[in-house]
Amino acid sequence: MVQPFNQFSTLEDLGDLAPILRARPNILALLKLFRSLPPDDVDIIARYMHGYVALEDTVVFREGEIGDAMLFIVEGMVHVYRGDPVDGVTLGLLDRGKSFGEMALIENMPRSATCVVLHDCMFAAMTRANFEHLTADHPRLAITVLKDVARMLSNRLRHANETREGGMFDFLDLQ
């Protein structure tokens, strides 16, 4: 059973992503993490995800909160920053196709940044619990997703190391 992303009451839960995909079948194809997967695999993954919407200025999550989901931006834009909203350091501006919160699938640790909706957003979310269900039900597919997440995080880390002298870097904008 798909577990909703209920940690954050500020997001409007659209429910199971599968009916949304029937109405708009190419939604997940927009997401960079799923572009290399066959359509049948994308359909399977969608059954383990929920859709959400959030209006401008909605805080999706805050730095320091324990994460329990990875989010994919289907529409809209998100500002990712550390520290104070006014004087903090911008880590990235993420738009359609980008993802954030990936580490929440892997570990139960505090979020490293705050994410705020800049332009009204639609998200597809994978909770840690749902990823564990995907792993139990479709291990080959879960390994593929995990490898892609690891590759994405590796690219971000590599870019961060290359641009270290520039401050906190714009590494979240890579995918």
What are the language-model segments listed below?
Residues M1-Q175:
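Cytosolic regulatory regions built on CNB/CRP/Popeye-like sensor folds
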